[in-house]
Amino acid sequence: MKKIQTPNAKGEVRIIAGLWRGRKLPVLNSEGLRPTGDRVKETLFNWLMPYIHQSECLDGFAGSGSLGFEALSRQAKKVTFLELDKTVANQLKKNLQTLKCSSEQAEVINQSSLDFLKQPQNQPHFDVVFLDPPFHFNLAEQAISLLCENNWLKPNALIYVETEKDKPLITPENWTLLKEKTTGIVSYRLYQN
């Protein structure tokens, strides 16, 4: 018999390498939440290996925080987690406390990723951006536009985007597609601006 998931049932994500290798963190099961699988995460961080150390990262549409926690474990300088759902954002904060992360290393902002990115910036902030939005809402393209329009990206920033498989993605002309793979129902790509 299949177990019925309640909204506050807990799953977990595993950190696969770095300072907290093998550590498992609780994740609330929430509608639309799809933590990035270990194989995809391992491939992504193999791509990012030369760049992640001391980088400033944005985990947009953070959800489980799987990508941001992995970046912190691999010694990113700072990760900003954006999460709209207050309960999920609170779980991210608890996990950061469990890992003993300071506010200089990580912050959780309980706000829509798109609303956050609408704020124009005087100076760019991020070396690496993770975008893994809920599927079927075209949120990735909206977030990409806002990242560029509002000066969030440092020169040569790396932008990781997860979308539904076979969904064409419109990106700025000056972005270079560095890597692309598909698995199951997911396409994932790494760009550089």
From Swiss-Prot:
PROSITE patterns: N6_MTASE. CDD domains: AdoMet_MTases. The keyword Methyltransferase applies. It is an enzyme of class 2 (transferase). GO terms for molecular function: 16S rRNA (guanine(966)-N(2))-methyltransferase activity; nucleic acid binding. Gene3D superfamilies: Vaccinia Virus protein VP39 (3.40.50.150). Keywords: Methyltransferase, rRNA processing, S-adenosyl-L-methionine, Transferase. Its EC number is 2.1.1.171. Pfam families: Cons_hypoth95 (PF03602). The keyword Methyltransferase applies. InterPro entries: DNA_methylase_N6_adenine_CS, RNA_MeTrfase_RsmD, SAM-dependent_MTases_sf. It comes from the Bacteria. It catalyses: guanosine(966) in 16S rRNA + S-adenosyl-L-methionine = N(2)-methylguanosine(966) in 16S rRNA + S-adenosyl-L-homocysteine + H(+). Specifically methylates the guanine in position 966 of 16S rRNA in the assembled 30S particle. Belongs to the methyltransferase superfamily. RsmD family. This is Ribosomal RNA small subunit methyltransferase D. It comes from Haemophilus influenzae (strain ATCC 51907 / DSM 11121 / KW20 / Rd).
